[in-house]
Amino acid sequence: MSESERSEAFGTPDAAEVERLRREVAALREQLEGSAARGPGDSGRLRDLNQLEARIDSLNARNAKLMDTLKEARQQLLALREEVDRLGQPPSGYGVLLAVQTDETVDVFTSGRKMRVTCSPNIETSELRRGQTVRLNEALTVVEAGNFESVGEISTLREVLDDGHRALVVGHADEERIVWLADPLIAPDLSEVSEDADGADLKPRKLRPGDSLLVDTKAGYAFERIPKAEVEDLVLEEVPDVSYSDIGGLARQIEQIRDAVELPFLHKDLYQEYSLRPPKGVLLYGPPGCGKTLIAKAVANSLAKKMAELRGDDSREAKSYFLNIKGPELLNKFVGETERHIRLIFQRAREKASDGTPVIVFFDEMDSIFRTRGTGVSSDVETTVVPQLLSEIDGVEGLENVIVIGASNREDMIDPAILRPGRLDVKIKIERPDAESAQDIFSKYLTVDLPVHSEDLAEFGGDRGLTVKAMIEKVVDRMYAEIDDNRFLEVTYANGDKEVMYFKDFNSGAMIQNVVDRAKKNAIKSVLETGQKGLRIQHLLDSIVDEFAENEDLPNTTNPDDWARISGKKGERIVYIRTLVTGKSSSASRAIDTESSLGQYL
């Protein structure tokens, strides 16, 4: 027990009495121990002594409880005093750090005023960063350093000024203002650049025009770059893993696009020697499911590897950029947003291509956003979207190391200004596969490593390669045979001519893949039902029948001319379609009642 506690404890009546009794007992004990002979009254004295000791013990226990109670009360009083002091403190203010001075003072923006204040001794001014939030006491002294502001207004970066610390931003009402850049937005090595260095070297490398910045307009600071989710979702920056060897039946088209895209990048010196301008864009058009998107992906993959070989790099680390633009998702209901997205996409392409790396901008379903102006087919959005694309392709800035590839199955709906030479120079039609091309496509999906039924293998002496080849030949012969089972449609043209079309006239690479997938599924079901493992020719033939049966209802007999354009049958206008699939009723055929519905196509 401390002296203070002892004094407080002895200040109570019980403590004083305990101390008096303790002294009395001690005196009596000394008398008893000092007497040489004990008289008859000694036993009574001993009894009184024991009673006194018991009373002392009781009082000691009581005194200990009182001491504990006093200690607890003291702690509660101290806690209440601290709480009262805390509640009585004046409020603290917050401000934005603007600059640190050499005399350990700082400039802050607080309550709408710019002030120079002092810092608490426990604040290291060297660790403070511009744009940081600081806490001020009632004397306007910095007592705590906080984080950077995480809420505010969103402004668009127009440009970074030459000093590298300020930027021109545009607000929602197109109001331009100059703001300071917080330290996180400045290049990490900015502090290592000498003051007499060129201003261009001081520009933050992480910022680019068009970025969205979090801005405190009152303090005049930009704190953070906000990712633009709407553009990130539309663009896929990666090299696809599709090669030309994965594409079947399109050898001629592949050669055309390699001449248009790869030659200018791989042989720039020859193009310059002959004063030949590389094409700026390629249009891949044709019926759906015939490999337009697949070719565009293979171009990016092949170009990246060829450029890596040309530079002497490892082809496995080949680098190029394939910006896959989802056409329909570009459209935005707000005026000017679609055009802004297109500007940002080409701005990103220019940045990626600035170091000589090839960049491919691929617009899938191009007709959905770049339709002919003034047709009335859709809204008037194309009147501003099309000129934006035209200005990006061959505007003042120009495109270096950037190739635009568009894919569409309705090239007749794309604005003619986009298709003229100098923009999308090369136009490659992706035809429907013929019998030879179909065999090539089947060979990509029916490979020798697939399990083949033992009976089919036995027919060819156990040679797996010959068995697979025979499977492909038989299924192609069945698919392309001009027999009654393969009759699909009878079309009537405007001049009265009629023509019978077979399923082979509407075949595509996607349909072939679907046939093989059906056959594989049938083979799996056979294993589960019969226990016999392996793919059979009959599985493929049954899959063809099922695939044809699913497609028999697909022709649009309400608007046959429109359907014919999508399906790839162009030429004389079609006015009547009659399905010839067995079991179909004659009611499936339908003529065109009026020509008004076809006015936009004539």
From Swiss-Prot:
SUPFAM superfamilies: P-loop containing nucleoside triphosphate hydrolases (SSF52540). ATP binds at residues 289-294. One of its GO terms (cellular component) is proteasome complex. It comes from the Bacteria. It holds the Pfam family AAA. Keywords: ATP-binding, Chaperone, Coiled coil, Nucleotide-binding, Proteasome. Pathway: Protein degradation; proteasomal Pup-dependent pathway. Residues 601-602 are annotated as: Docks into pockets in the proteasome alpha-ring. InterPro entries: AAA+_ATPase, AAA_ATPase_domain, ATPase_AAA_core, ATPase_AAA_CS, NA-bd_OB-fold, P-loop_NTPase, Prot_ATP_ID_OB_2nd, Prot_ATP_ID_OB_N. Transmembrane segments: none annotated. The keyword Hydrolase does not apply. GO terms for biological process: modification-dependent protein catabolic process; proteasomal protein catabolic process. Residues 13-89 form a coiled coil. Homohexamer. Assembles into a hexameric ring structure that caps the 20S proteasome core. Strongly interacts with the prokaryotic ubiquitin-like protein Pup through a hydrophobic interface; the interacting region of ARC lies in its N-terminal coiled-coil domain. There is one Pup binding site per ARC hexamer ring. Upon ATP-binding, the C-terminus of ARC interacts with the alpha-rings of the proteasome core, possibly by binding to the intersubunit pockets. ATPase which is responsible for recognizing, binding, unfolding and translocation of pupylated proteins into the bacterial 20S proteasome core particle. May be essential for opening the gate of the 20S proteasome via an interaction with its C-terminus, thereby allowing substrate entry and access to the site of proteolysis. Thus, the C-termini of the proteasomal ATPase may function like a 'key in a lock' to induce gate opening and therefore regulate proteolysis. Belongs to the AAA ATPase family. NCBIfam families: pup_AAA (TIGR03689). Consists of three main regions, an N-terminal coiled-coil domain that binds to protein Pup and functions as a docking station, an interdomain involved in ARC hexamerization, and a C-terminal ATPase domain of the AAA type. This is Proteasome-associated ATPase. It comes from Mycobacteroides abscessus (strain ATCC 19977 / DSM 44196 / CCUG 20993 / CIP 104536 / JCM 13569 / NCTC 13031 / TMC 1543 / L948). The gene is mpa.
